[in-house]
């Protein structure tokens, strides 16, 4: 049975949509995702949360099944806290990304259906990493994942500069997210922003 036949027989066995992005800017890291949660063609929630705090200096933005995102983030958060208790220092962004990679690869036969951008601030400065469902870890300066990613990453590609300040990064993130949402029926209903800087973490929701 091919995928088309499967989807005809099980019309709701479909990948959920999302538009999610992350970027490094001069003062820190910006993560963003929209709020719509879909089940097939039905919008199950207009207030889904797809950006997550892992520690005070690391967070993640995800696209995929919300339940799988939540399980993955809880496990990475637990390992990060255990690391800090064990060695009396905070886990680095790179190490947290590797922990997430190992968890995803360990589930490769029954994968967690989520693409993830993990990022934050540590002693090496701001950084982000992109992970697929099998745990591949790709460092980058900016990235977008999800069904609206092709449109969003085009806006980032055209306008991104690493020396952007916080306001410029926020404006670009919102612009890229709105562009992705405008062409993706499975994304929408506002944007959640998560920012990590030396001064700490901040969250913001943008309605439109």
PLM feature spans:
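Long, low-complexity N-terminal extensions
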Residues: 1-208
């Amino acid at each position: 049975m091919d995928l088309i036949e499967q989807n005809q027989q099980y019309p709701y066995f479909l990948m959920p949509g999302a538009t999610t992005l992350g970027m490094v800017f001069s003062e820190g890291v910006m993560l963003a995702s929209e709020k719509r949660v879909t089940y097939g063609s039905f919008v199950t929630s207009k207030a889904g949360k797809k950006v997550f705090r892992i520690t005070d200096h690391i967070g993640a933005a995800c696209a995929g099944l919300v339940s799988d995102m939540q399980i993955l983030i809880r496990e990475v958060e637990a390992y990060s806290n255990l690391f800090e208790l064990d060695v009396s220092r905070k886990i680095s962004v790179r190490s947290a990304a590797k922990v997430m990679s190992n968890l995803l690869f360990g589930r490769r036969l029954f994968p967690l259906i989520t693409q993830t951008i993990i990022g934050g601030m540590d002693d090496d400065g701001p950084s982000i990493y992109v992970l697929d469902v099998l745990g591949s870890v790709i460092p980058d300066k900016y990235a977008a994942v999800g069904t609206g990613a092709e449109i969003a990453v085009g806006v980032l590609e055209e306008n991104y500069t690493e020396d952007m300040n916080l306001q410029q990064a926020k404006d670009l993130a919102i612009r890229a997210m709105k562009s992705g949402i405008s062409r993706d029926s499975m994304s929408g209903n506002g944007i959640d922003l998560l920012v990590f800087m030396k001064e700490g973490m901040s969250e913001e929701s943008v309605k439109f």
